[in-house]
Amino acid sequence: MSSQVISASRLYQIVASPTSDNDAKSRSINELKTHVKKDFVDIKQVPKYVEALSIAVDISDTGISTSSFSVLSHLVKRVSMQDSSGEVLKSQSYLVLPIIINRLGDIKASARISAKKALEAYWFSAPKEVEDSIIDIAFSHKNSKVINESIIWLDHIITNVNPHFKINLFLPHIVKLLRLNSDSDEVLIENIKTLFKDYYSLKHNRLYKFDLSKEFDTQKIPSNVHESIISQIGTSSSILMKQATPDIGLDHNFISAGTTRVTVNSMGRDKGTISSNSSTPASLSSSTMSRPKSRTNFHNYTKSISPSQEDEQITKPSVHNSAFNKYNTNQMSAPAKPVAMVNENSNEINSEISPEIEKIIAKTFTYKIDSSILPLDVKDVDDLCGTINELLPIFEGKETEFNWGMREKNIIKLRSIIRGNSSRLFTNELTSYLKESSESICKAVTSLRTTLSSHGCHFLKECAIILKEHFDPLVDSYVPHLMKLCSATKHIASSNANMALCAIFINVPYNYRLLHKILVSANEKNVQPRSYSGIWLQVVLVRFHDTSSFSYRGSNSISGLDTSIKILTKLLADPNPNVRQVAKDTYWCFWDKFPSEAESLLTRLDTNVVKAIERSKPRTITSRNQPSTLSSLTARKARPSIKESIIARNKELRKQKDQTSISRPSSRINSTSSPCPPDNDYLQKHDKPQFSTLDSGKFSRLGVAKRTPSTSSLSRVESNQDAITRKVSDSVSSNAKKHNDSQGINADAQIQNIETMKSTYSVDDNSSNRTNMEQTNKFESFDKQSDPILKFLSSNQKEFITEGINLLKYAIMGEEDLSSEVNGLLKKISVRNQDLLKPLFLSTDNLFKKTYQFFSFEDFFRVCCILIHTIDTRLVDLIVSIAGVDDIYESAIKLISYTTNLGNIIDDSDLTMQIIRFKSIIVRSIIEFLNQGLDKIPISDSYFSKLVTNLFELVSLVKSTGLYKSFCELLIKLYSINPTLFTSELQMIATSTREEVEYVVGIDDVLDLNRGHAINFTTQYELTRVVPGNNLRKMSPLKAPSDLTMVVPVEKELFEDDNIDIDSKIQSESANDTGFRTPPKLAGNHTSPIHSERSTIIETDGNISDNVEEYVNDAMDVDQNPSEEIVNGLKNDIEMHNDDNKVKEKTSNDMSDSLPLIDESDNIFVEIDSDSASRKPDLFTKFAQHDNSSELVENFAQVKITELSKQRLRNNDPIKKFIDKVDPLNKISLKNKPISIYEDVNFKGSPQKVKDYSYTELNWFNFQLAKLAMDKEDNQEIDYCIEDFKSLCDNLSSKKIEGKEFVSVLNYLQNIQISNAEFSRYFQSSGHSLIENSLWNFFDNHINLPVSKKLSGLILLKQLLINRLRVSLDRLWNLLVGLSSESSSSVDELSLAISEAFDEMLAGLFSSEIIFARILTTLENAVLERESFSLPFILECLSKVLSTNAVSLLIDEKLIMRIDNVLSGFMNDEEVEIRRCVISSYGKLLKASRISSSIETNEDIRSEYSVMDDILKKLSIPQKKLIEYYSQS
């Protein structure tokens, strides 16, 4: 008995819900574990399981966290067995792999073992993702255990799993670890030695030993370590050095991008490699990464990596030495202004910078510009503009597998342009073009493709070095994207961004916004930008410390010096040791430039920080010139204990208690200690009046004090810091206890008690601060370390954060000065604990507006969507009043893109989890906001396109939810704003989604070549609806043919309000000419697009009586000469019907006058000429259908199943069939006859149905027609002259036909059905064969025809096939095969045209069996004469034929064996496309054989499936899996 299946959504709700207890979570997780271990899991629910478990592993409860990881490990193993494609695990690698790799460093051995087993199972399904994660996460992990275990895991894979596994990808990183830890981590060194020994001792890896030796020399591994490892392998390093001597000139053709370079051939190929300064050995470049054997064909790819001189880009975050190297000299060098000198006779660009700055960045990257790229000169400004504009179109839209290579080539070309003469001769124009194209370049910089991103970063670095101060206008366009990239998890990308930013800071002139950006980076939650911010600050200090602008206080009264102190204060107290090390180096740089300010800064720092700074003192700073306060601060008495501080503070409070006045505290900013509980009498006496005043909005009367500088001494601050947290914690816990003991206490009273406590203690603190002010006045600025708001908001406990939010609320209302650090803390809270922000967002409108200044609008809008559940007009007006239009639409678009694709969230796991939890709430809020906001906020075309594109992705998500009605209203509103842009974006989405949206908004585009434009109808039902009336029951069977396209019941509610008879309503829509009534817009209660449309076509008496003969011929579709009795009977019926019409028209004249009718000239389905007027009665018959449901019931009641003999089937009288078909009363007479159902015992399958062609499908042929329709003259008329047609055919046959003549021939072919009668008869008799023969003559010796004429001929040929006119199959097939051999690529225009022509062959005009036999014959000849055939095209055709339903009726054992004999010879072909087509054909053949086997009842006939089994047994496992995959498509 299988275990209970756990619902993924239910598990997610339990785990993510804050109200669920730990027991329920643990129980649910254990149930899932039992299910996963025993039974198969539902693959579709795996992503939701992973999301739930990723939340559960972070729960503080140890038992839940351990169980969750155990379940996750079992789930990975289970999915790897079930999902042979590996797509599920690949898509979830961003969530699962970081969890597994982090567990490699777990304290428990069992957890580490489980992690390694799970990683191995994951590797079998997603090898590339696992290997990339090991490099990006494991090798740069701060836990040394993780690094060690990852090395051990690699050794396990080589020795126990796959001895052919290649470590070329990991080699540079492993050697880097060896170099960094050669003296510190002996265990890691031994593990690496073991790995190298096990790997290079294998027989097939011995030839690659010299690669290891070369890597050691490149990264300068100590000789003792080098020799010890090489000796273990068994070869001396001297021999390896001889083997590793580079062959100069082996690989000259490369473009360098740091550690990454791209091999190119005149910018024509993109072959990605990663190499060192020396040439790549042939053995290494030809080696491939070995994958798990079961997935070799899926994942093999060539990859080799070796570090260059910029090897720091692939290592862990650099750890700076404690001694600052740049102070080794006794005298500092004056900063020199960087100058980039371009040598016009060489492609090298010399860049000179200050030696001091060079030492700062030396350990991070190489400042020198790469010389491997040749400069590209331009003639003039127009040449520069044209060259850049040619490079930009490829960057439009999203990055895909097919365009990233071209983007990389274009960035390389931009690197050549910046090296050329444009930077000297056209500097301003070049700068302007770079600013306009910033969006495209930033797409390359932030790309997930490492080589593309590297080239983008190097391009910006080179721009800054070459353009220097001219790069300043581009700073705001590029720096934000680079700083965001610094937070990337991929260390190469992060290092490249840091390199580009350093180059910018080195070269651009000073501006305060640069320092502000550094300050923002110093407050980032990611450690990498915080570490880099110290380096950037050093560069700025060295360059601008002696400039007046650096010390100038601008409009915000903040100088560069003040901002530098803020950055240093933040970095020196950073929890990360790497950041603190950089900060200490930065401090000594700051001390060298501003000694007095540096000494003052020391007095504000913690004692431990000061001691750490003392230990990192450079050697050049002796006791004589070190900071004077440094010794005194480090030697001072230790601060008092917590107990002493509490006793002293209580004494002070008792003295001040009697002197405290009843008023609101002047400021909570000067408070340096946390409150402790006052007595209850005081609370009861003073808390309520204070809160009533605040809540009433009269905050200004309380005399709120502005922030005043902190005056407490350094020792006083330090002695009270610990007491702050302790007392506030006691206060909160005390309040919680009171609440539990007395449940009847009002919640508002408790809040007031807490507020009053804060007021009392703030008053006491103010008194204490005034005393301290009299004693000392050292600090002239506010001390952030003592700010209670910052302390509360930076806490991890919700109680403290809540207190901080309340304090911040009243500080905002009082318009107090607040630290800029509040912004970063609020951003963190908005992602992790957004519910705590309710006091700021759900109070008054004034507070709501003021709160906005502390958030970016994206964060502000996201919190609004989550917290505010009702989006009304007031909220929309508030948001519009405080934010810009661009910010609103940009934020809405981003949030929608996050909900549809979590991959759009870059390196923010907290935000990812928030979007997962509140996805539905965010989508609902955005839809409601846009529904109301679009009427008030103008929207530009660019934002309109982005918005509708993202909304289209929501269609499938909201369709079955309650949001769908509002979502449809939003789409209709957007369509009404800009129909053209809406329709163009709609064409880019999937067909199913497009049809859904078209149905919602009422779009139905029909392309008419003769008119040259598209006419829109409300829906596709407009032209096919039939509204039956009571009067139709009296009509003869001739007037109610059975071939109507659609019958829809009358919607009575359309006429209930007017009390109008339905038949009268129908007749009111009649007119003298055939026409369509304009569909009304959606209004009132008519929500369905179908309900809103009605179209009626009624003919006048004159038309009907004049054209009775034509009418009968069209309605019956039989002999053109009917009997006189039939015609007379039809005339009588029509006259009776017209009499009824006349009577009803008298009662509905007023209504018919008000109905708008479209003239025939506007009807794309009616051709305007004299010869076509006689065809109008045919349209009338489509509205003569009566309700025959009772007749159908009667017929089916008389069904009698009989089996006729074969002889009777053969002896069916064709004359009798013809008489029955012509007889107008045959339908009525059939009611009395039994209905026979025949069993086709000797006929396999049903007759093949000819498919109708769709001119609205997006393909090459329709695109050509659309182009011709746009170029066609409006007044061009077609004269269907037989002589002109013959003349055109003669020109076609002699290959002299040109553009206008070609269009004329195409028009003849397209309008055969509506041409005059004389031409129609001629074309049916001899014109068809004439145009066919002309085409064959045209294509004779087609190898000499230009491509444009070949395409024109194929258009005519396909039009013949679309008209369902038979042509010679043999000549047609030979022509397509011959043309396919002349195409240069499988994706060029000629190949598309040929492929579409073959698709039309399969539309039913020719028998599938005949086409099948022709293809097999051609393939059998191709086995012997390969060079004379285009194999990919023929094999693709075979695959298409095998995909048709008719093939399953033809399959038998002999045919399967024949196909196998043909295809087996191409299974191992050198061309990938041929192998793909062969595998695809085998897959379709397997599918067809299974279908054939399932429908056969004769056991002798069902043997072909066993034949397929025999064929599959001959193939390899990967080939079998591929065939199985294609058989399911």
Swiss-Prot record:
Residues 273-290, 660-674 have a biased composition (Low complexity). Coiled coil: none annotated. Transmembrane segments: none annotated. It is found in: Cytoplasm, Cytoskeleton; Nucleus; Cytoplasm, Cytoskeleton, Spindle. One of its GO terms (molecular function) is microtubule binding. GO terms for biological process: astral microtubule depolymerization; cell division; mitotic spindle assembly. InterPro entries: ARM-like, ARM-type_fold, CLASP_N_dom, TOG. Residues 266-314, 617-638, 651-745, 1070-1090 are annotated as: Disordered. Keywords: Cell cycle, Cell division, Cytoplasm, Cytoskeleton, Microtubule, Mitosis, Nucleus. Residues 295-308, 619-634, 708-723 have a biased composition (Polar residues). Pfam families: CLASP_N. Its main location: cytoplasm. GO terms for cellular component: cytoplasmic microtubule; microtubule organizing center; mitotic spindle midzone; nucleus; spindle microtubule. Microtubule binding protein that promotes the stabilization of dynamic microtubules. Required for mitotic spindle formation. Belongs to the CLASP family. Interacts with microtubules. PANTHER family: CLASP, CLIP-ASSOCIATING PROTEIN. This is Protein STU1.
